[in-house]
């Protein structure tokens, strides 16, 4: 058995994490400048190699926890990227994962420690290797699922206004949404609950605050917007 494996060249496997946040009505991406060769100084996603005792998912969870200090994040595999020349250092196949976080939950000291920046997706710079393609594929994945899965709530605080929720959808879809129709549909969804609290910070008149009832959704996980 050992001889069989030794006859084949070694290929490295890594994970790269595409971390999206929502701030100032914009969908943002967490990136930093590479501190090693190849590509030193280039903008890049954050990732790491898969350990010998790790699954792909476990490796991505480890990287995300190191990066954000957060656990139990929404995370989804985007795909595998294995172009022969994607990494000039070694033959590396990377599996990309998309994560959604509430920016307010993110420990800013960790961002500073890793030298990371929140960059609006619409102004995303050229990234290292095929990382722009990873982000593009992750965004396409979110657009495919946002109307059939409650993804957007991962980007919002526990209590949010309908305006904030609409802006998340518009930021991900890249288009404006009719306010009247959006609110009419939202009010038909049982697990988006209106609370008795009022937002007086982002609304001059005071806007009602809503919350996502995950328990109610789990009991009847049908979502279509």
Regions found by a protein language model. Name each.
Residues 2-43:
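N-terminal strand-loop-strand
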Residues 11-13, 58-61, 65-107, 123, ...:
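Active-site segment of metal-dependent pyrophosphate-handling enzymes
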Residues 26-70, 82, 147-167:
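Conserved Nudix-box catalytic region and its N-terminal flanking loop in Nudix hydrolases
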Residues 29, 33-36, 40, 47, ...:
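Short, His- and charge-rich active-site/binding loops that engage polyanionic ligands
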Residues 167-176:
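Short helix-coil junctions and helix-kink-helix linkers
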Residues 177-208:
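RNA substrate-recognition surfaces in RNA-acting enzymes
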